[in-house]
Amino acid sequence: MKKKRSIILISILIIVSAVIYFYKPQQNNSYQLGVIISIGNKDKSNILYYNDELQKTGQKKLKIGNIASQYDIPKTVNDKVYMIPKGVPYVNEREEVMELDHNTQKIKLYKIGRPGLFAFDEKDGDIYTTNWINGVSTLTKYNEETGKIQRYEESVGMFGYLHCAGNYVYVEKQVDQEEGTINYLMKIDRKTLKKVKEIKVNHSEDESVFFYSDDKNLYFSSGNIDKILYQMDLKKDKISKLKLKEINPQQILPYKNKLFVTHCDLTSGMGKAISLLNPQTGESKVYKFKHNVIQCQTKEGYLYLSLIHI
């Protein structure tokens, strides 16, 4: 256990595919840690539960494979956690978003009706997903209470990752042109699912995987070698660049008035650094580890890491 500036770093070894998240059941005042261990070629997954001292408290077995990954991390909303269960490729591929209620241990599967779900977000009882098939990109909005589905589609470019902030859902779009791949950020009204505007981000084949927003700004990474984290003013829709000291910025997590940014190649699992960035001043401090860092979560002054040994 290693302590730096009151941040305690706890590592969890990835066995097959493991993703960590936090939840807070109603019957317990303390947060619990869930570790999803999933197999890609079998309909089999386990969720292991730990308390805040990393003592195992239980597990839940699921007959669904390929649940979540370092690319599509689960989202916790109070005592529920949402994730994409992709299923077994070419055998039992799924078109759903899964909800696990940690108070009842019941699972709900919301049928989106589109194959190859790429990314998702959840806000105010609505689930948003993206997918691309047969040259058409689709943004889907699914109401959890009524089952009503709305879709927005385009035949130019590929929709990627997305993030809900305020009254809008922001969707990454990549378009291949003669001068190369251009990344855009679409601003779409969450109620009507109509596109408000499209903002050019950069020329890069790297996609924006991770987002984070506060009341004023949207932050997103692009896994680039230019050591840049993007910041967009939510009122002005103006994008600026925050310079980092390491390549491959990925996951963005808030800590007090600063941001943790992981640095990792998500495909290879290689990357041993995390930045602590002050977005107001642009100053950052880099923490380097002896192991690779593939994913992390913060909770109550602790930084929890999952890693791959290569």
Spans of features found by a protein language model:
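An edge-strand/N-cap motif at the start of beta-rich repeat modules
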Residues: 23-63
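Conserved small/polar residues in nucleotide/adenosyl-binding loops
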Residues: 308-310
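Solenoidal tandem-repeat scaffolds enriched in leucines and small polar residues
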Residues: 152-230
